[in-house]
Amino acid sequence: MGSCSLQLPLINLADKTLEPGSSKWAEVRSDVRKALEDFGCFEASYDKVSLELQESIMKTMEELFALPVETKQRNVCPKPYVGYLNHNNLSESLGISNANILENINEFTQQLWPHGDGNENISKTIQLFAEKLVEIDVMVRRMVMESFGIEKYIDDHLKSTAYATDELNIVGVEPNVGVKVNADISDDVNANASVNAGVGANVNADTGVNDNLNVDANVAVGGGVNANTDLGVGVNVNSNVAVNAKTGGDDVEANDDNEEKKLGLPCHTDKNLFTVLFQHEIEGLEVKTKDEKWIRVKPSPNTFIVIAGDSLCALMNGRIRAPYHRVRVTEKKRTRYTAAIFTCPKPDYVIEAPKELVDEKHPRLFRPFDYRDLFTFYHSEAGRKIQYTLQAYCAVSEA
């Protein structure tokens, strides 16, 4: 169970004197690096996302999920995991491609409201929220590269992650389902779980989904500047989940004191570069530390969780860790909303640690790879059985 005493580092990214080249920038940059080295994530204070915008994005999710199923089914897209999806009648998702571009968001709302001009308020809310989270992502990535002395690669790095294939995935879990899970879980969401729904149905569910689509109701919405992100706005509905699991490494706390667990998302690492996550009111996120302890992250206004992914770990030659984390909802009869951007390398970008990060003390840990190939392996039959995806896919044998 997540500890209430342990806390993630809290870093203020909205200080008025925080400008590149300033003493405050150097101070915060050092704090960001240490947090990512120690925890793989941190809590960012960023009051540039107004409380009004926070409430607007959550009201947007409520309005979208309240639409009839036949209306949501109008949301179609040829890309995998984008467009309307129903997941074993336990959750559903909507998707927007290139969600940083307002006209694309308008196309999405016009699918749902075809007899008018879509929904201008929803479109603008999604765009504004995506832009703010992208500001955090770009700032943190710049600080990371500067702190390791590879600032000469910053511009190329930002261009290599241009927001070209952004998506908005809205995922919801049916309320009061009462799901009991008995699973063999070895890595993260790669595990195949046998799910028995409390509504009397027996469902075999494959929980191997990508960063854009999380079984606990995450979001993915992309947008912004110079980065390929998926910004997610989603929900966790309290699904009264009991878990009895065998794990191959990172546990899902098997039957701890027979306590009912509300597991929205099994233990996993993200495969992308960075995730910037916003929890709205209902807590649930738990992060695993180096010494195998869980930190339960409590939501608060104007704070966002910045999480490093496997791709960043490889790019930085293992100097930054990608933390295992999960979602465990304990609130009763309440819906948990979250929103996040997932920054991913664009197609054909090869992830390789710069030569400046490789020396006798830090030998090369991972072979160069294309993010799409890593993701394909992650979802393959072989990949689903692997405990540590990144190491299994591209670790240097001598490392």
From Swiss-Prot:
Q: What is the protein name for this chain? A: Probable inactive 2-oxoglutarate-dependent dioxygenase AOP2
Query: Which residues participate in Fe cation binding?
Result: 268, 270, 325
- Which organism does this record belong to? Arabidopsis thaliana
The record's listing under InterPro entries reads:
DIOX_N, IPNS-like_FE2OG_OXY, IPNS-like_sf, Iron_ascorbate_oxido_reductase, Oxoglu/Fe-dep_dioxygenase_dom
Q: Name one GO molecular function term.
A: 2-oxoglutarate-dependent dioxygenase activity
Q: Can you give the residue ranges of the Fe2OG dioxygenase domain?
A: 248-345
Which Pfam families does the UniProt entry name for this protein? Answer: 2OG-FeII_Oxy (PF03171), DIOX_N (PF14226)
Keyword annotations from UniProtKB, A to Z: Iron, Metal-binding
Gene name tied to this protein: AOP2
Is this entry keyworded Transport? no
Source organism phylogeny: Eukaryota, Viridiplantae, Streptophyta, Embryophyta, Tracheophyta
Q: Which free-text remark accompanies the cofactor?
A: Binds 1 Fe(2+) ion per subunit.
**What does the entry list as the binding residues for 2-oxoglutarate?**
336
Q: Which cofactor does it need?
A: Fe(2+)
Task: Please state which protein family the record places this protein in.
Answer: Belongs to the iron/ascorbate-dependent oxidoreductase family.
